[in-house]
Regions:
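Short-chain dehydrogenase/reductase
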Residues: 65-66, 101-123, 148, 174-175, ...
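Conserved Rossmann-fold NAD(P)-dependent oxidoreductase catalytic core, especially the SDR/UDP-sugar
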Residues: 48, 73-112
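NAD(P)H-binding glycine-rich loop region in Rossmannoid oxidoreductase-like domains
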Residues: 31-73, 78-80
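Amphipathic terminal alpha-helices
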Residues: 267-297
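NAD(P)-dependent short-chain dehydrogenase/reductase
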Residues: 127-172, 179, 185-186
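SDR active-site strand-loop-helix element
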Residues: 6, 52, 86-92, 136-138
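Mid/C-terminal beta-alpha module of Rossmann-like enzyme folds, strongest
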Residues: 183, 190-244, 284-290, 295
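N-terminal Rossmann NAD(P)H-binding glycine-rich loop of SDR-like oxidoreductase domains
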Residues: 1-24
Length: 297
């Protein structure tokens, strides 16, 4: 199976490359930008196109959101002209106001934000005009490296001694980019073998948690590992924000369909964070300049 991936520097693109390198049944062609022409599809002849998500579109620059939506539409038109399946990953933030109960796939987002509405309109057109598509809605992605690598950004900020601020009243399911990459390749392999299970799916980590609790847990686990290594680092703190005073905003995706159709189980975000922190610590061993003052006491 040959996949064409856009936006080479995105954390999900890097995760897909790592996953493909562990397998012998997947070939990846990765484009540097979020741009595609029908002629490029003719050259590569992929079995599917994969577009990584625009992370945190609610706080992104409006021009970036518009550009992403327009690029997705151009990709959809190219795929339609060459009958190439399209997989587009989108942020759970499209469900701007959340829901009290877990959100099923058939619930189409109806945001008030103009930028989010552009992304929803792109999804509507894909569903209407390109039968062979996967729209995969993701919880907040985290990874150690690449664009939108939330966990890497948190670690850099904490180690620099700067404080982090996170909402204590926004509940979601953090999602490992590595877990998404493994799931996407498995899903597309089944489609390539004739599953024909096109449509919208939800993919997120297990255990809903507030942004504040997630960031606090990352800080605690980081401090524990650094102490175990004998390193003294004055980590930045974590401060709680509260924007939804009446009740927490819950943005929790119901992921049963991806399990029932493709057999994809959600990975616990705590285990994924722990694994990535272990990898981050090993990388420090290979980079002496990254090590901080060691407590000699």
């Amino acid at each position: 199976m040959k996949l064409l991936i856009l936006d080479a520097g995105h954390c999900l693109s890097l995760a897909l490359a790592r996953e493909a390198n562990r397998r012998s049944d997947v070939e990846l062609i990765i484009e540097p930008r979020l741009a595609l022409t029908p002629e490029r599809l003719d050259e590569v002849r992929p079995d599917a196109l994969v577009i990584p998500p625009l992370s945190r579109p609610l706080t992104a620059d409006p021009a970036s959101v518009t550009a992403h939506a327009e690029a997705v539409m151009a990709c959809m038109a190219a795929c339609r002209s060459r009958d190439v399946p399209l997989t587009w990953c989108v942020s759970d933030q499209l469900y701007e106001d959340g829901f009290e109960s877990p959100i099923d796939e058939h619930v189409i987002p109806e945001p008030r934000d103009e930028g989010l509405r552009r992304l929803v309109a792109a999804g509507d057109r894909i569903r209407a005009e390109l039968p062979r598509h996967l729209i995969v809605r993701l919880g907040p992605l985290f990874a150690l490296e690449g664009g939108h690598a939330w966990l890497g950004e948190l670690l850099d900020t904490l180690v620099a001694g700067d404080d982090l601020r996170a909402e204590s009243d926004v509940i979601f399911c953090p999602t490992s980019a590595d877990a998404v990459a493994m799931a996407l390749i498995g899903m597309l392999q089944q489609q390539h073998c004739g599953a024909e299970a096109w449509g919208s799916y939800h993919l997120a980590g297990t255990e809903p948690v507030s942004a504040y609790t997630f960031v606090s847990m990352v800080r605690t686990q980081l401090a524990t590992r650094l102490e175990g290594r004998g390193e003294t680092v004055a980590l930045g703190g974590v401060k709680a924000l509260s924007h939804h005073h009446d009740q927490p905003l819950r943005r929790v995706l119901n992921c049963r369909r991806v399990l029932n159709v493709f057999g994809v189980h959600q990975k616990p975000w705590r285990l994924e964070v722990g694994r990535m922190l272990d990898a981050w610590c090993l990388a420090r061993d290979d980079d002496p300049a990254a090590s901080k003052e060691v407590d000699q006491a």
